[in-house]
């Protein structure tokens, strides 16, 4: 493994409609088989529905939903003297967003609604109201970290 320098993270282009890098990242996470225009259509349609339900702008509503799913701590496995401990660690800001977006998309895909846009809109609405599968996932991760607080001194 080369040890010369740390490669910085690539800059992604902001999405064309709202000019948000966060939304562009979300579209990229939702995208399947390189079909970006399809993913954009789904996201924009879902955001429109979300904005109508919440009475806020599309970006504000999306930000609120994302904020309610972002984890602050997670557990990482750490091997110490033949046994593995789940050590709670703080989540870096970039990873917080990535995990939240991934969980929202996963939860939306598992829903039983008709179209993906509707599934995504419903999941984002639930996330904005602090309920739903994605929020439950965050609660589970936080609970796991809380339960393993005793191993926090094994941080690296």
UniProtKB/Swiss-Prot annotation:
Query: Which GO biological-process labels does this protein carry?
Result: translation
Q: Name one GO cellular component term.
A: small ribosomal subunit
Q: Which domain of life is it from?
A: Bacteria
Q: Which GO-annotated molecular functions does the record name?
A: rRNA binding; structural constituent of ribosome; tRNA binding
Query: In the UniProt record, does the keyword Glycoprotein occur?
Result: no
Name the InterPro entries for this protein.
Ribosomal_uS7 (IPR000235), Ribosomal_uS7_bac/org-type (IPR005717), Ribosomal_uS7_CS (IPR020606), Ribosomal_uS7_dom (IPR023798), Ribosomal_uS7_dom_sf (IPR036823)
Q: Does the keyword Ribosomal protein apply?
A: yes
State the CDD domains in the record: uS7_Bacteria
Alphabetized PANTHER family for the sequence: RIBOSOMAL PROTEIN S7
- Oligomeric state and partners? Part of the 30S ribosomal subunit. Contacts proteins S9 and S11.
Q: What function does this protein fulfil?
A: One of the primary rRNA binding proteins, it binds directly to 16S rRNA where it nucleates assembly of the head domain of the 30S subunit. Is located at the subunit interface close to the decoding center, probably blocks exit of the E-site tRNA.
Q: Which HAMAP family match?
A: Ribosomal_uS7_B
The protein's name in its UniProt record: Small ribosomal subunit protein uS7
Source species of the chain: Klebsiella pneumoniae subsp. pneumoniae (strain ATCC 700721 / MGH 78578)
Lineage, opening ranks: Bacteria, Pseudomonadati, Pseudomonadota, Gammaproteobacteria, Enterobacterales
């Amino acid at each position: 493994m080369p040890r010369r320098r740390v490669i910085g993270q690539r800059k992604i282009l902001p999405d064309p409609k709202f000019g948000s890098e966060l939304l562009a990242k979300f579209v990229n996470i939702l995208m399947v088989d390189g079909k970006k225009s399809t993913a954009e259509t789904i996201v924009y349609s879902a955001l429109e529905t979300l904005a109508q339900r919440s009475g806020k702008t599309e970006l504000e509503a999306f930000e609120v939903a994302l904020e309610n799913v972002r984890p602050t701590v997670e557990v990482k496995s750490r091997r110490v003297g033949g046994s593995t401990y789940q050590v709670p660690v703080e989540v870096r800001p970039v990873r917080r967003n990535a995990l939240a977006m991934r969980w929202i998309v996963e939860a939306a895909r598992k829903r039983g609604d008709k179209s993906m846009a509707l599934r995504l809109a419903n999941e984002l609405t639930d996330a904005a109201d602090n309920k739903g599968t994605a929020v439950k996932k965050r609660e589970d991760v936080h609970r796991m970290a809380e339960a393993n607080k005793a191993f926090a001194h094994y941080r690296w």
